[in-house]
Amino acid sequence: LNMTKLTYAKAINSALKSAMSCDEKVICYGLGADDPKGVFGTTLGLKELFGNERVFDMPTSENALTAFSIGLSMRNYKTIITHQRVEFSLLAMEQIINQAAKWNYMNAGQMSVPIVIRLIIGRGWGQGPQHSQSLESIFAHIPGLKVISASNAYDAKGLLLSSIEDKNPVIFFEHRWLHQTIS
């Protein structure tokens, strides 16, 4: 059996490319999504492959980023949002908890919100205490949310692909220290 070894970041990138190639309704956006550094390398080359309409940056307003995603999902889009730090998602909790997580229940299972919210966790260089928290347990206690945290590249790719296909919101945690690990 010959398995290709990838970094965690390349596995995320590969999953995004695969999902976006298979379904033109998959959109990837967030702060830095179209940046030359590509959110720790995870979105590199996506804008060139899929264009500005499907891979784009947005103004810094986490609540609006998330609300936009919910709106797109109601138009049958599957969105992948990236918040480069988990703490930024706290500014979108109203949308995540009161809208996305409850939408399927509020509509008797007739409408879903197929969004993936990628949250980067872990301390980085020069990061203060406001940018180095692990808030997984907060999200794990919200009915209607699925919470994922892959420990290796192989699992990250498979779990991200599954998350994108899920009909309901998924919080996808990525530890920044894992992005350059190989598995």
Where do the PLM segments sit?
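Thiamine diphosphate
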Residues: 2-178
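Glycine/aspartate-rich loop-and-adjacent alpha/beta segment that forms the canonical ThDP
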Residues: 180-183
